Amino acid sequence: MTIVCENIKKFRKFRGLSQAELGEKIGRSKNVVSNWERGENEPDLDAIAAACKVLGVTPNQMFGWERHPEYDAFYKRMFVYEQKMKELEEKRKAIDSELASIRKMLSDQ
C-alpha cells in the first residue's frame, strides 16, 4: 500500500466521509475507493487531484511530502484526551475500590 492510499483513508476519515461519499464526490464508486484504501489498486492522477480538492489537502500533503497542520493538531488533541481518559479511568477504579471497602466495612458492623 502506498502513502497516497493510506492518506486517502486517513484524510477521508478525518473529514468524516464514508467511502461512498468520497467516491460520489470524485466520480468513483465506493468499491474503487475501498480498493485504493486496501492497496489493491492505485488512484490515477485525476482521482488524486479530485480527492485532494474534496478532502481539503494539497497534493504534497497527499503524497506525504508535507504535513497537514490541521490533521496533526487534531491528533495531538486526541492523544491528550486519550491520556486524560486513561487517568480518569484509573481514578474511577480507585474510587470503586474504595467504595467497595467502605461497603464491606459497613456490612461487617
Give the predicted meaning of each segment.
Residues N7, S18, D44-A47, T58:
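Residues that mark the N-terminal boundary/hinge immediately upstream of a DNA-recognition element
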Residues G16-N35, A50:
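Short alpha-helical DNA-recognition segment
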Residues G27-P43, G64-W65:
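Recognition helix of helix-turn-helix/homeodomain-like DNA-binding domains
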Residues H68-Q109:
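Interfacial/linker helices and their anchor residues that mediate assembly or domain coupling
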Residues T2, K13-F14, E42:
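Short amphipathic helical patch at the helix-1/turn junction of helix-turn-helix
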Residues M1-I3, A73-F74:
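A detector for short, charged/polar N-terminal pre-domain segments
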Residues G27, D46-Q61:
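DNA major-groove recognition helix of helix-turn-helix/homeodomain DNA-binding modules
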Residues E6-K25, K84-M85:
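Short basic helix-loop element that most often maps to the first helix and adjoining turn
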